[in-house]
């Protein structure tokens, strides 16, 4: 199925690209999320007429994401207290929701879907580096300090 991308999509293309994707991917993900429209003649003409407007909107979103990433990077360290055993192992774990709540409490709004934990959830006390994907091409980094209660 041919679609016109309205946003940058990882491993697919950027704004204005006409790409061929499977019908289910387009129908169930790209179109409902507003990332693409079917490439009909009407949509192609409509897109070409609004291309500059869409590019400006995309640039504004990218600028806002960069500003949020700077705020997140400015935090440097966020502390989370959790119950832990003698050897520093946590009772339970600290996941994306806990990290997002702690960063939000520190003053920067973050959704749990933006938190990236490459090594899985945090299960030990100490300092852990956590990445945030604020936008498809904007990343931020914070040190999470897990302390025992």
Curated annotation (Swiss-Prot):
InterPro entries: Ribosomal_bL9, Ribosomal_bL9/RNase_H1_N, Ribosomal_bL9_bac/chp, Ribosomal_bL9_C, Ribosomal_bL9_C_sf, Ribosomal_bL9_N, Ribosomal_bL9_N_sf. Keywords: Ribonucleoprotein, Ribosomal protein, RNA-binding, rRNA-binding. It holds the Pfam family Ribosomal_L9_C. GO terms for cellular component: ribonucleoprotein complex; ribosome. PROSITE patterns: RIBOSOMAL_L9 (PS00651). One of its GO terms (molecular function) is structural constituent of ribosome. The keyword Ribosomal protein applies. The keyword Ribonucleoprotein applies. It comes from the Bacteria. GO terms for biological process: translation. Belongs to the bacterial ribosomal protein bL9 family. Binds to the 23S rRNA. This is Large ribosomal subunit protein bL9. It comes from Salmonella arizonae (strain ATCC BAA-731 / CDC346-86 / RSK2980). The gene is rplI.
């Amino acid at each position: 199925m041919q679609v016109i991308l309205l946003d940058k999509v990882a491993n697919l293309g950027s704004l204005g690209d006409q790409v061929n994707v499977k019908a289910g991917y387009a129908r169930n993900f790209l179109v409902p999320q507003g990332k693409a429209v079917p490439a009909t003649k009407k949509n192609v003409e409509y897109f070409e007429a609004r291309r500059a407007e869409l590019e400006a909107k995309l640039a504004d979103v990218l600028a806002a994401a960069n500003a949020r990433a700077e705020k997140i990077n400015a935090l440097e360290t966020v502390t989370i207290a959790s119950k832990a055993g003698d050897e520093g192992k946590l009772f339970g774990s600290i996941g994306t929701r806990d990290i997002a709540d702690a960063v939000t409490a520190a003053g920067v709004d973050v959704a749990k879907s933006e938190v990236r934990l490459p090594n899985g959830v945090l299960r030990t006390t100490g300092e852990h580096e956590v990445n945030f994907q604020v936008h498809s091409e904007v990343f931020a980094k914070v040190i999470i300090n897990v302390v025992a209660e």
